[in-house]
């Protein structure tokens, strides 16, 4: 799947032992078939290694199992950033406002 040109995005969860996979990753082949990589927790070691060895930007965030109860706001953010590539700097989440400005 990592080297399949038809696959555009890979989500994977965290997991103890992710760091043990690093010596077995073929970074050259990943660079030849770039895609979006998204994970969290222990998967960060793999995300950082992919970036460090390929200059491909990786993403820390949602994994598929967390999409069951995703809010509309989070769904819009995810789609605009990673699917459509049309993200704006800021999408308002609610009509809340600060009573007193913070630091």
Give residue spans per PLM region:
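Short, Φ-rich (hydrophobic/aromatic) sequence segments
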Residues: 1, 48, 75-79
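Short glycine/serine/threonine-biased micro-segments
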Residues: 12-13, 37-40, 100
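Conserved active-site and cofactor/substrate-binding residues in soluble primary-metabolism enzymes
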Residues: 16, 41, 45, 73
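Short glycine-/acidic-enriched loop or helix-start segments at secondary-structure transitions
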Residues: 19-22, 47-49, 70
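Short, glycine/charged-enriched secondary-structure capping and boundary segments
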Residues: 24-27, 52-54, 74
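Short, acidic/small-residue loops that bind anionic groups at enzyme active sites
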Residues: 27-49, 57-64
């Amino acid at each position: 799947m990592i080297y399949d040109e038809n696959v555009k995005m890979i989500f994977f969860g965290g997991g103890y032992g992710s760091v043990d996979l690093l010596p077995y990753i073929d970074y050259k082949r990943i660079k030849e078939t770039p895609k979006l990589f998204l994970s969290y927790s222990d998967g960060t070691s793999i995300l950082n290694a992919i970036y460090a060895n390929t200059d491909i930007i990786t993403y820390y965030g949602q994994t598929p199992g967390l999409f069951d109860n995703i809010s509309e706001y989070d769904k819009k953010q995810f789609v605009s950033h990673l699917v459509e590539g049309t993200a704006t700097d800021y999408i308002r989440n609610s009509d809340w406002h600060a009573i007193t400005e913070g630091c």
